[in-house]
From Swiss-Prot:
Pathway: Cofactor biosynthesis; NAD(+) biosynthesis; deamido-NAD(+) from nicotinate D-ribonucleotide: step 1/1. SUPFAM superfamilies: Nucleotidylyl transferase (SSF52374). GO terms for molecular function: ATP binding; nicotinamide-nucleotide adenylyltransferase activity; nicotinate-nucleotide adenylyltransferase activity. NCBIfam families: nicotinate (nicotinamide) nucleotide adenylyltransferase. Belongs to the NadD family. This is Probable nicotinate-nucleotide adenylyltransferase. It comes from the Bacteria. One of its GO terms (biological process) is NAD biosynthetic process. InterPro entries: Cyt_trans-like, NadD/NMNAT, Rossmann-like_a/b/a_fold. It is an enzyme of class 2 (transferase). Catalyzes the reversible adenylation of nicotinate mononucleotide (NaMN) to nicotinic acid adenine dinucleotide (NaAD). It comes from Bacteroides thetaiotaomicron (strain ATCC 29148 / DSM 2079 / JCM 5827 / CCUG 10774 / NCTC 10582 / VPI-5482 / E50).
Length: 202
């Protein structure tokens, strides 16, 4: 296990498709910075997996641009395309290993939902991830976590639950609903313009 060092920056790795990023993502990361004393949270956009058919992922560059817009005003947020430059498919264990190697001045904390923790044993080299990294679990409805049974490197955070999903946002947009208050204002405006431009081009 890599022991945390007080002189290193505590950096949360919030990895996801962000398809698209919404206020639930931002509010959770805000909570982790302010209440769990993370110095920064990196929104690490997961690339499209060419081996995974049938996904509804928006283009990589669009999802990354929306994360950039959503995070640029808060100094402790950072957008990241780190996984775009790794061999695919990119497993979390390899991403974390490369992060430690590239940024030795930082301590990294993997941020996952309790729904993912419930099936964490299916992750590639999950035991190694637990052994070599710190993990922060945030609550998700329907997936309680027994804090007493957690490994030393894993901790449950008591953040508010945000029952907003990217799937809901996409469906609402398909139905031409006005969901501006579910998104950062810059993200909302960019998506509106993107849709308008797509209609014009077609």
């Amino acid at each position: 296990m890599r022991m945390a060092e007080s002189n290193k920056l505590k950096t949360g790795i919030f990895s996801g498709s962000f398809n698209p990023v919404h206020i639930g993502h931002l509010a959770l990361a805000n909570y982790l910075c302010e209440y769990e004393e993370l110095d920064e949270v990196w929104f690490m956009v997961s690339p499209q997996n060419p081996l995974k058919a049938g996904t509804e992922l928006w283009p990589d560059d669009l999802r990354l641009r929306l994360v950039e817009l959503a995070t640029e005003e808060y100094p402790r947020f950072r957008s990241s395309d780190f996984e775009f430059h790794l061999p695919r498919p990119s497993y979390s264990v390899h991403t974390l290993e490369k992060l430690h190697e590239t940024y030795p001045e930082r301590d990294f904390y993997l941020i996952i939902g309790s729904d993912n923790w419930a099936r964490f044993d299916r992750w590639y080299q999950s035991e190694r991830i637990i052994k070599e990294n710190r993990i922060l679990i945030y609550p998700r409805p329907g997936f309680p976590v027994n804090e007493n049974g957690l490994p030393e490197t894993v901790r449950l955070v008591h953040s508010p639950t945000f029952e907003i999903s990217s799937t809901f946002i996409r469906q609402a947009l398909d139905e031409k609903k006005d969901v501006r208050y579910f998104l950062h204002p810059k993200v909302w405006e960019y998506i509106r313009e993107y849709i308008r431009q797509s209609i014009t081009d077609n």
